[in-house]
Protein backbone atom coordinates (compact mmCIF):
# COMPACT_ATOMS: atom_id res chain seq x y z
CA UNK A 1 0.00 0.00 0.00
CA UNK A 2 1.27 3.47 -0.87
CA UNK A 3 1.00 6.10 1.87
CA UNK A 4 1.01 9.86 1.47
CA UNK A 5 3.28 11.91 3.81
CA UNK A 6 0.33 13.01 5.96
CA UNK A 7 -0.89 9.41 6.32
CA UNK A 8 2.59 8.25 7.28
CA UNK A 9 2.79 10.92 9.97
CA UNK A 10 -0.52 9.77 11.45
CA UNK A 11 0.52 6.10 11.31
CA UNK A 12 3.79 6.97 12.99
CA UNK A 13 1.96 8.86 15.72
CA UNK A 14 -0.34 5.91 16.44
CA UNK A 15 2.63 3.56 16.75
CA UNK A 16 4.44 5.96 19.08
CA UNK A 17 1.33 6.27 21.23
CA UNK A 18 0.81 2.49 21.42
CA UNK A 19 4.41 1.41 21.98
CA UNK A 20 6.46 3.51 24.39
CA UNK A 21 9.76 2.37 22.91
CA UNK A 22 8.77 2.92 19.33
CA UNK A 23 10.38 5.73 17.33
CA UNK A 24 9.84 6.72 13.72
CA UNK A 25 12.92 7.23 11.55
CA UNK A 26 11.16 10.02 9.67
CA UNK A 27 11.90 13.52 10.95
CA UNK A 28 8.99 15.67 12.00
CA UNK A 29 8.73 18.69 9.73
CA UNK A 30 7.93 21.75 11.84
CA UNK A 31 6.81 25.03 10.29
CA UNK A 32 7.60 28.47 11.66
CA UNK A 33 7.74 32.11 10.65
CA UNK A 34 10.73 34.02 12.14
CA UNK A 35 9.24 37.50 12.55
CA UNK A 36 7.97 37.42 16.12
CA UNK A 37 10.79 38.11 18.59
CA UNK A 38 11.61 36.67 21.03
CA UNK A 39 9.29 33.75 20.23
CA UNK A 40 10.85 33.25 16.82
CA UNK A 41 13.23 35.48 14.88
CA UNK A 42 16.15 35.40 12.49
CA UNK A 43 19.69 35.70 13.84
CA UNK A 44 21.26 38.44 11.66
CA UNK A 45 24.72 36.90 12.09
CA UNK A 46 23.81 33.39 10.92
CA UNK A 47 20.49 33.81 9.11
CA UNK A 48 19.08 30.95 11.20
CA UNK A 49 15.86 31.01 13.19
CA UNK A 50 16.32 31.43 16.94
CA UNK A 51 14.04 32.13 19.89
CA UNK A 52 11.73 30.50 22.40
CA UNK A 53 9.99 28.35 19.78
CA UNK A 54 13.27 26.93 18.50
CA UNK A 55 14.52 25.95 21.96
CA UNK A 56 11.05 24.72 22.92
CA UNK A 57 10.85 22.49 19.84
CA UNK A 58 14.29 21.05 20.62
CA UNK A 59 13.12 20.12 24.13
CA UNK A 60 9.93 18.60 22.73
CA UNK A 61 11.93 16.52 20.27
CA UNK A 62 14.22 15.26 23.02
CA UNK A 63 11.27 14.37 25.24
CA UNK A 64 9.47 12.58 22.38
CA UNK A 65 12.59 10.82 21.13
CA UNK A 66 12.29 12.16 17.57
CA UNK A 67 14.22 14.47 15.28
CA UNK A 68 12.76 17.67 13.90
CA UNK A 69 13.49 19.67 10.78
CA UNK A 70 12.39 23.30 10.60
CA UNK A 71 10.68 24.58 7.49
CA UNK A 72 10.38 28.37 7.25
CA UNK A 73 6.81 29.02 6.18
CA UNK A 74 4.97 32.31 5.72
CA UNK A 75 2.43 32.79 8.50
CA UNK A 76 -0.50 32.79 6.08
CA UNK A 77 0.69 29.45 4.64
CA UNK A 78 1.07 27.57 7.92
CA UNK A 79 -2.45 26.12 7.99
CA UNK A 80 -2.57 25.26 4.25
CA UNK A 81 0.85 23.59 4.54
CA UNK A 82 -0.39 21.53 7.48
CA UNK A 83 -3.52 20.51 5.58
CA UNK A 84 -1.56 19.33 2.55
CA UNK A 85 0.90 17.33 4.64
CA UNK A 86 3.96 19.49 3.97
CA UNK A 87 4.21 20.08 7.73
CA UNK A 88 3.66 17.67 10.62
CA UNK A 89 2.92 20.58 12.95
CA UNK A 90 3.85 24.21 13.32
CA UNK A 91 5.08 26.54 16.04
CA UNK A 92 4.45 30.22 15.42
CA UNK A 93 2.52 31.56 18.42
CA UNK A 94 -0.75 31.34 16.50
CA UNK A 95 -3.85 32.29 18.49
CA UNK A 96 -6.12 29.35 19.24
CA UNK A 97 -9.55 30.48 18.01
CA UNK A 98 -12.85 28.70 17.42
CA UNK A 99 -12.70 29.59 13.73
CA UNK A 100 -9.25 28.08 13.30
CA UNK A 101 -10.28 24.97 15.22
CA UNK A 102 -12.57 24.17 12.29
CA UNK A 103 -9.42 23.45 10.25
CA UNK A 104 -6.88 22.08 12.74
CA UNK A 105 -6.23 21.23 16.39
CA UNK A 106 -4.11 23.29 18.77
CA UNK A 107 -1.86 22.06 21.54
CA UNK A 108 -1.67 25.28 23.53
CA UNK A 109 1.74 26.27 24.88
CA UNK A 110 1.61 30.05 25.51
CA UNK A 111 -0.93 32.68 26.45
CA UNK A 112 -0.95 36.39 25.73
CA UNK A 113 -3.09 39.49 25.74
CA UNK A 114 -3.24 42.44 23.38
CA UNK A 115 -1.55 45.64 24.52
CA UNK A 116 -0.88 49.03 22.96
CA UNK A 117 2.61 50.46 22.64
CA UNK A 118 3.50 54.06 21.86
CA UNK A 119 6.76 55.92 21.43
CA UNK A 120 8.01 57.00 24.85
CA UNK A 121 8.38 60.52 23.48
CA UNK A 122 4.66 60.57 22.65
CA UNK A 123 3.32 58.92 25.80
CA UNK A 124 1.63 62.20 26.80
CA UNK A 125 -1.14 61.28 24.33
CA UNK A 126 -2.79 59.20 27.03
CA UNK A 127 -2.46 56.51 29.68
CA UNK A 128 -5.63 54.53 29.03
CA UNK A 129 -7.02 52.67 26.04
CA UNK A 130 -9.91 55.11 25.87
CA UNK A 131 -7.44 57.92 25.26
CA UNK A 132 -6.73 56.23 21.92
CA UNK A 133 -10.30 56.25 20.66
CA UNK A 134 -10.14 58.00 17.29
CA UNK A 135 -6.39 57.42 17.01
CA UNK A 136 -4.61 55.48 14.26
CA UNK A 137 -3.31 52.12 15.48
CA UNK A 138 -1.23 49.58 13.54
CA UNK A 139 -1.61 45.82 14.04
CA UNK A 140 -0.48 42.74 12.14
CA UNK A 141 -3.16 41.71 9.67
CA UNK A 142 -2.07 38.05 9.97
CA UNK A 143 -3.34 37.87 13.56
CA UNK A 144 -6.73 38.37 15.21
CA UNK A 145 -5.57 41.54 17.00
CA UNK A 146 -7.32 43.78 14.47
CA UNK A 147 -10.65 42.07 15.19
CA UNK A 148 -10.02 42.31 18.94
CA UNK A 149 -9.30 46.04 18.77
CA UNK A 150 -12.32 46.73 16.57
CA UNK A 151 -14.55 44.82 18.98
CA UNK A 152 -13.11 46.70 21.98
CA UNK A 153 -13.44 50.01 20.14
CA UNK A 154 -17.10 49.38 19.26
CA UNK A 155 -17.90 48.66 22.90
CA UNK A 156 -15.78 51.28 24.67
CA UNK A 157 -15.37 54.07 22.11
CA UNK A 158 -18.43 54.09 19.85
CA UNK A 159 -20.94 53.25 22.59
CA UNK A 160 -19.44 56.00 24.75
CA UNK A 161 -19.97 58.55 21.99
CA UNK A 162 -16.29 58.66 21.07
CA UNK A 163 -14.72 58.18 17.65
CA UNK A 164 -13.83 54.58 16.88
CA UNK A 165 -10.18 53.54 16.76
CA UNK A 166 -8.73 53.60 13.25
CA UNK A 167 -7.04 50.20 13.15
CA UNK A 168 -4.77 49.71 10.12
CA UNK A 169 -3.20 46.45 8.97
CA UNK A 170 0.55 45.90 8.97
CA UNK A 171 2.52 43.11 7.29
CA UNK A 172 3.69 41.86 10.69
CA UNK A 173 4.71 43.20 14.11
CA UNK A 174 8.05 44.43 12.81
CA UNK A 175 6.26 46.48 10.15
CA UNK A 176 3.83 47.83 12.77
CA UNK A 177 6.71 49.06 14.95
CA UNK A 178 8.33 50.67 11.92
CA UNK A 179 5.10 52.53 11.14
CA UNK A 180 5.07 53.77 14.73
CA UNK A 181 8.70 54.93 14.59
CA UNK A 182 7.95 56.79 11.36
CA UNK A 183 4.98 58.52 13.04
CA UNK A 184 2.58 57.08 10.47
CA UNK A 185 0.41 55.80 13.32
CA UNK A 186 -0.25 56.94 16.89
CA UNK A 187 0.19 53.52 18.47
CA UNK A 188 0.61 49.86 17.66
CA UNK A 189 -0.96 46.76 19.13
CA UNK A 190 1.30 43.88 20.12
CA UNK A 191 0.93 40.57 21.91
CA UNK A 192 1.84 41.34 25.50
CA UNK A 193 4.19 38.39 25.88
CA UNK A 194 6.71 39.92 23.46
CA UNK A 195 6.77 43.46 24.85
CA UNK A 196 9.38 42.99 27.64
CA UNK A 197 11.86 41.67 25.07
CA UNK A 198 11.21 44.57 22.69
CA UNK A 199 11.68 47.09 25.48
CA UNK A 200 14.89 45.34 26.47
CA UNK A 201 16.53 45.53 23.05
CA UNK A 202 15.22 49.03 22.27
CA UNK A 203 15.63 50.65 25.67
CA UNK A 204 13.60 53.78 26.22
CA UNK A 205 11.94 53.71 22.79
CA UNK A 206 8.52 52.22 23.60
CA UNK A 207 6.04 52.61 26.45
CA UNK A 208 2.98 50.46 27.07
CA UNK A 209 -0.54 51.82 27.44
CA UNK A 210 -2.86 50.49 30.15
CA UNK A 211 -3.19 46.74 30.81
CA UNK A 212 -3.47 43.95 28.22
CA UNK A 213 -6.93 42.95 27.00
CA UNK A 214 -8.32 39.68 25.62
CA UNK A 215 -5.93 37.10 27.03
CA UNK A 216 -6.00 34.04 24.79
CA UNK A 217 -4.06 30.85 24.19
CA UNK A 218 -1.49 30.29 21.47
CA UNK A 219 -1.01 26.81 20.13
CA UNK A 220 1.06 24.38 18.15
CA UNK A 221 -0.96 23.59 15.04
CA UNK A 222 -1.57 19.89 14.35
CA UNK A 223 -3.79 18.15 11.80
CA UNK A 224 -7.17 17.42 13.39
CA UNK A 225 -7.00 13.75 12.39
CA UNK A 226 -3.51 13.24 13.81
CA UNK A 227 -4.69 12.58 17.36
CA UNK A 228 -1.57 10.57 18.32
CA UNK A 229 0.74 13.49 17.54
CA UNK A 230 -1.55 15.84 19.46
CA UNK A 231 -1.32 13.57 22.50
CA UNK A 232 2.44 13.10 22.18
CA UNK A 233 2.99 16.87 22.05
CA UNK A 234 0.62 17.41 24.96
CA UNK A 235 2.35 14.79 27.10
CA UNK A 236 5.82 16.12 26.27
CA UNK A 237 4.76 19.67 27.15
CA UNK A 238 3.21 18.55 30.42
CA UNK A 239 6.46 16.82 31.42
CA UNK A 240 8.37 20.02 30.63
CA UNK A 241 5.95 22.03 32.79
CA UNK A 242 6.25 19.54 35.65
CA UNK A 243 10.06 19.36 35.68
CA UNK A 244 10.71 23.10 35.26
CA UNK A 245 12.19 23.10 31.75
CA UNK A 246 9.24 25.08 30.42
CA UNK A 247 9.60 27.82 33.06
CA UNK A 248 13.35 27.98 32.41
CA UNK A 249 12.77 28.63 28.70
CA UNK A 250 10.28 31.41 29.47
CA UNK A 251 12.88 33.04 31.72
CA UNK A 252 15.68 32.62 29.18
CA UNK A 253 13.73 34.49 26.50
CA UNK A 254 12.34 37.13 28.88
CA UNK A 255 8.71 36.12 28.45
CA UNK A 256 6.47 37.30 31.32
CA UNK A 257 5.23 34.74 33.83
CA UNK A 258 1.61 35.39 32.81
CA UNK A 259 2.53 33.95 29.39
CA UNK A 260 2.83 30.46 30.87
CA UNK A 261 0.02 27.96 30.35
CA UNK A 262 -1.08 26.40 33.66
CA UNK A 263 -1.14 22.94 32.06
CA UNK A 264 -0.81 21.37 28.63
CA UNK A 265 -4.08 22.12 26.86
CA UNK A 266 -5.72 21.02 23.63
CA UNK A 267 -8.00 23.59 21.96
CA UNK A 268 -7.95 25.68 25.17
CA UNK A 269 -9.26 22.77 27.23
CA UNK A 270 -7.45 20.32 29.51
CA UNK A 271 -6.50 17.33 27.39
CA UNK A 272 -8.13 14.95 29.88
CA UNK A 273 -11.49 16.60 29.16
CA UNK A 274 -11.45 15.70 25.47
Predicted segments, located by residue:
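Extracytoplasmic small-molecule ligand-binding "clamshell" domains
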Residues: 26-93, 102, 169, 232-233, ...
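A ligand-binding cleft/hinge motif common to bilobed small-molecule-binding domains
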Residues: 77-80, 94-102, 148-152, 181-215
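Ligand-binding cleft/hinge of the Venus flytrap
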Residues: 43, 57-64, 145-169, 199-203
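Short coil/turn segments
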Residues: 35, 45-48, 95-96, 119-124, ...
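Periplasmic-binding protein-like
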Residues: 34-36, 111-118, 199-238, 255-274
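Extended ligand-binding regions for polar small-molecule ligands
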Residues: 54-63, 122, 129-144, 219-258
Amino acid sequence: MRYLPKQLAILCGWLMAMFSGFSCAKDLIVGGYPSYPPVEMRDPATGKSVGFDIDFAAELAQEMGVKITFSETAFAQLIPSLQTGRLDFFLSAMNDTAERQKHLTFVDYLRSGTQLMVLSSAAVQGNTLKDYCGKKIAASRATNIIAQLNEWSDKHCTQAGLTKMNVVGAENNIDARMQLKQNRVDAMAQDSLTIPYIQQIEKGVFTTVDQPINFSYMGMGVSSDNVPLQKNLQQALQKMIDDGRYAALLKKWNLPEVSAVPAALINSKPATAL
